[in-house]
């Protein structure tokens, strides 16, 4: 990222003012925080979605406290890269939104409606002085009546739908592999094995201890460590 020149320093200190060349520097810095986060990935296969992420592991940490894969509703989950404290706040809001939809309409929320809620919340933080952008990006994965979806939300609040995509520090390698080898008609087993292969190459890991993977079809299923070891 180019260095900020002295004449831009005033625009660098506030989120609510564009620089003369149309930039919001704090949003750009938030995106840099995402690039430094551990890798998170998602892909769609024939009947569902695979989400995966890497946990920062330390010897004495309780594994549950390091989670980056979040179940939001029975049919939707998410992975995040960047500041996990920011991610947890937003995930809590998404879970409430999903439950309100079930109570109000007696049906599960569709994936795009939930993603728009996330994008709107993140975008609001780019509008007002005294706030900062959320330093996190998400991949929202789920299956609804329109099929499987992977939707990215970045710190600006922009939403993109992908067949296969990665965020975080390993994204350049992972997205190159997706572009070269991804096939949308993969079955579940092939999709999970392909995802593990991409993770191993993008993060250069050899064991399953730091990997989290969820498979989403009718429901969210988070793979156990034993299941991951068999696939590795």
Residues covered by each model-derived region:
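Long, low-complexity N-terminal extensions
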Residues: 1-232
């Amino acid at each position: 990222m180019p260095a900020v020149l002295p004449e831009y320093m005033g625009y660098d200190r506030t989120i609510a003012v564009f620089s003369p060349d149309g930039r919001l520097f704090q949003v750009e810095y938030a995106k840099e925080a995402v690039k430094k986060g551990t890798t998170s990935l998602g892909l769609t296969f024939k009947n569902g979605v695979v989400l995966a992420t890497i946990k920062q592991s330390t010897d004495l940490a309780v594994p549950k406290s390091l989670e980056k894969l979040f179940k939001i509703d029975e049919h939707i989950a998410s992975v995040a890269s960047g500041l996990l404290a920011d991610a947890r706040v937003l995930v809590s809001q998404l879970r409430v939104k999903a439950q309100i939809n079930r109570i109000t309409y007696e049906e599960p929320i569709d994936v795009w409606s939930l993603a728009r809620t996330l994008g709107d919340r993140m975008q609001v933080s780019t509008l007002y002085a005294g706030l900062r952008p959320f330093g996190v990006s998400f991949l929202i994965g789920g299956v609804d009546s329109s099929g499987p979806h992977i939707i990215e939300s970045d710190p600006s609040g922009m939403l993109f739908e992908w067949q296969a995509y990665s965020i975080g520090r390993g994204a350049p390698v992972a997205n190159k592999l997706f572009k070269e080898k991804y096939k949308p008609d993969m079955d579940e087993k092939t999709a999970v094995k392909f995802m593990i292969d991409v993770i191993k190459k993008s993060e250069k890991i050899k064991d399953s201890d730091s990997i989290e993977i969820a498979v989403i079809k009718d429901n969210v299923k988070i793979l156990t460590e034993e299941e991951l070891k068999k696939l590795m």
